[in-house]
Amino acid sequence: MKKIILEKSTLLTLLVTSGVFMGGTCVFAEEPVERFTLGEFVVTASRVATNKSDTPANISVITKESIADNNYSDAAEAISKIPGVNVLGSGAKGTSMGQDKILINGDERVLILVDGRRVNLGSSGNYSADWLPPVNAIERIEVLKGAGSALYGTDAVGGVINIITKKGSELESHVTVRAASGSWNTEQYGITAGGATENGLGIFVSASKDRRGNYSYKDIDGDVKTMPNSGFNTDGVNLKLDQQIGKDNRITMQFEHLNTEGGAPFGYYGITTTDKHKRLNNNLSMRYDWKESTDNSGYMQIYRNHHHAQFLSPDKDNKSDFIDSTWGVDLQQSFKLSEKNNLITGISYYKTEVNNDVMFDGKKEIDNQAIFLEDRWKFADSWQLNTGLRFDHHSTYGSELTPRISLNKKLNEDTNVYLSWGKVFKAPTVQDLYWKQNMPYEYNGVWYDSWTLGNPDLKPEKGNVWTLGTNTKISEKTNFTASVFYSDIKDAIAWKGNSNGAYQAFNVAKEKRRGMELSINHYFNDNLSGYLSYTYAKSERNDGYGYVNYDNIKPNIYRAGIKYKNEKLILNMDLNVVNGQVLMYTNGYDSYGYADKSYFTLDLGAQYKINKDAKVFIKGYNLTNARYQEYGGKYSNGEAKYPMPSRSFIVGMEYNF
């Protein structure tokens, strides 16, 4: 980006404009995490590199430059800035044994990939944002919003997030150290080293440590209190080796390690001060790519993901110790059939074993075999048609075909319009099928059973997802994107109370989701940029008695921000407004809700580059000191079950050797 002087009048204009837009019912927006350019290449939408203007999908990209400029603490913070993506945090790391849930377009059925390798758990089908690779190891993040089942399979109903990590062979030799400290005894440390040897072996290694004490939150009376038992301690190591073989072939080995433990304060009936959680993740993969710089590229990879989680409690009925282990193999080949026609095909197999005596009465297994193909046909100079088909054979539910059709029209070099339809198929998880656990509780001196039950008679979820969108470059300094989506799912799986008082998985008749995303990104000059965004999502389910709201998670999100950058200094301001949350809504037999209908947060960041190798930074979060929650749920007194942190700060530095 070029450099010129910050104009005070321009800054004031943006602030006033942001306030006007957020006061209405609709805002146009885009986060600075993605600047739309027609020449940008992405891989997640089609499993191979394609020009974004020829990609009929709603896809966002976070670059390593954006990660560095914003000094994100982790990948969860980075992806939470993307319109259409929600990361549901709890303030502590102890919700549901440490899971910060990721949603796309209001849907939690999201597939998470690391360098194209699936990492979702077989037990829950999810993957916590807390477990993603550290930001110092990330080259870029691609987010596909909309169904990806035809290419990626059963978990990709709401979308796909692909974390692409750095390769040592593509880096200059370096060592980078980072340290930060902040509120609630926060300490963050990271070190990365990478480069290539004389014989071309690429080496990249990163190590990180993140720990924090008990955090503070604002309660229902407006008082700031400390959440007991909410501290955590996390260590991680990532290693990636890659070696080019010949001109266009490459072999890559990768290892990811994560060890985390902390308090779990969020009990169903109140705050707990003794429950703890621990988790160990060890993932290993090997991949061979051939003809990687050609139109006839392909690869084969084998992998093993190992997760060991423990929930520790003085209450023996509330303990849990489980292992979730998946091994798999992927094979993919692309073909250039003609100048206007490309085909990609592949096979995939994975097997998951889950062992938990408390939750599943021992070991459970599922496996899935699949073959897929997609044809990309430019049938005219400005038209492209993508047609795809996937065949899955699930060990429990047999065979299923999932087609996808996408149409892209390039109106000119600065604008494209796309329409995409996909059939989705989502098999129940091990947790949905086999969970069986009793957690007795005491109320007024009387003990009651509290069962959580899976349902082996569940049907798979099936349905359709539609996306219509456009990307356009209004001017040399202004980019605009817009999209709408709609999904209808039959036999959607929901957890709710049954007639015997147990919490159980059921198929509901129908589920509908609809929403929109509007975004604008403007560059006032070569130093100053701004963005505005609005996203809307609504989820409804019909149990045979009419549609009712379901989840009601952040139905309206307004975001705005500005960024100033010159050779030495970077300043960021991010505004976030959520409204439309329901204080009380029903989900089958159960009631949920939020302590507040709306909230407003403000984050500020500053970075100063001391020299070419060193920088210092400071960030402030929730400077409005708002009371808010991202997971729904209230206690009987109206207090939020999962309050998010109050105002906090972090200060750090980074040095390159």
Task: Show which residues each predicted segment covers.
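Short acidic/polar hinge/loop motifs at secondary-structure boundaries
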Residues: 101, 117-145
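Gram-negative outer-membrane beta-barrel transporters
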Residues: 343, 378-384, 481, 485-488, ...
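N-terminal Sec signal peptide and the immediately downstream disordered periplasmic leader
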Residues: 1-72, 76-82, 194-195, 235, ...
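A beta-strand signature from Gram-negative outer-membrane beta-barrel systems
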Residues: 135-176
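Conserved C-terminal beta-signal and adjacent last beta-strands/turns
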Residues: 7-9, 28-29, 194-196, 206, ...
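Outer-membrane beta-barrel signature, preferentially recognizing the C-terminal barrel domain
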Residues: 270-291, 322, 410, 414-416, ...
